[in-house]
Amino acid sequence: PLLLRAVGLLLTLDQVAALSCLDEQGRAVDWWILYKLPKQSTSKHPVAGPLGEGRAYAFLTSSLPNQRWTLSSMPIEDPNSMPGQVRTYVCFTIPSTSILQTLAPLYSNASSLFHLLYNDEEPHGKTSFTRGHTKGLVLATKDSGSIWLIHSIPHYPPFPNETYSYPRTGQRYGQTAMCVSTNSKR
């Protein structure tokens, strides 16, 4: 069964900027899709760097003119990566990535933010290899739009005031994430 972890907060609206998915440069985009590649290196066929270690990712964004997969030049845990960008303005320490920059409002003291987090794994339980890895979150405000992030990243996002590091199981296997922004006027 789907384990639901949900919290809704309605506080003061003026503390939240427009919600949007963010790319590697911190620019607002309508959507992005990320594929964290599985570990490519074996003892018989060693591959150096993030690709060999299972820390490389490729992405698409609504702003890419050619709409082709782009291999990121940085590992997924880098503060400027797509998942890590969220963290550049997050109030606690977790390795940064575009997902993290996108989620910064979740960890701020913004009082007008509604958030819903769902995960088919218990926050501090064992990783299951038999479930569908149903994970995601919704962030929304009355006037600043919303974000829906669907992903398969283990134990993500962390609870506020908890640290996060990309898990070893996440390095071995491929992971996906998709972020969609909505405008409050739509």
Predicted regions located by residue number:
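HKD-type phospholipase D/PLD-like phosphodiesterase module
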Residues: 2-186
